[in-house]
Amino acid sequence: MTSHVHPETSGSESALNSPVEIFSAEWILTVDQNDTVLTESAIAVQAGVIIAVGPLADLLRAHPSATHQHFDQSVLMPGMVNAHTHLGMTMFRGLADDRNLQQFLDLVMPAEAAVLREQSVSVATAAAALESVHAGVTTALDMYYFPDVVVAACDRVGMRVMTGTTFLGSVGPEGRGGSAQMEWTEQ
């Protein structure tokens, strides 16, 4: 049996007392260096952390009190990473489809100026994060405005996000430009 105990669970008393859940599917993509695809296998999870991957029978034997959920005709795989997102822009979906970059900017930038506020970015980011998680994306690198709001929205949804400050040649929707934006970033 292939088993990987995550270090966060090995020393945590509460994690060790958490119930074990076993998930199985027709196929498990390990995304290892050999692109191994497992069949008749499962993943054991405790306190939200994968603690073992291996043959289903072995995991059920090792964790007799675990709950087991099988996904017929399905694939279990690691979450995907979207390394270039503008999550908050989901509010403009359909506004400038099938346009070249300049046409896109000519349509979207005035719309952004009219509606970009913390609340609109929060709602749009949460909607995009929910859609992303539903599609198997667990992590995003987001480049948009109000990074603290983006982090909070993704946290509410349960999606990891990396983001940072957007710098423009003028005052942006956050009400800061140039050195004020840099000072805010450094705090």
Please state what every model-predicted region is:
Residues 79-85, 140-141, 161-164:
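Hydrophobic faces of well-ordered beta-strands that scaffold small-molecule active sites
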Residues 93-159, 186-187:
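Alpha-helical scaffold segments that flank or form the walls of functional sites
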Residues 14, 151-187:
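Metal-coordinating catalytic core of metallo-dependent amide/deamination hydrolases
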Residues 33-34, 43, 81-82, 92, ...:
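Short capping/connector residues at structural and topological boundaries
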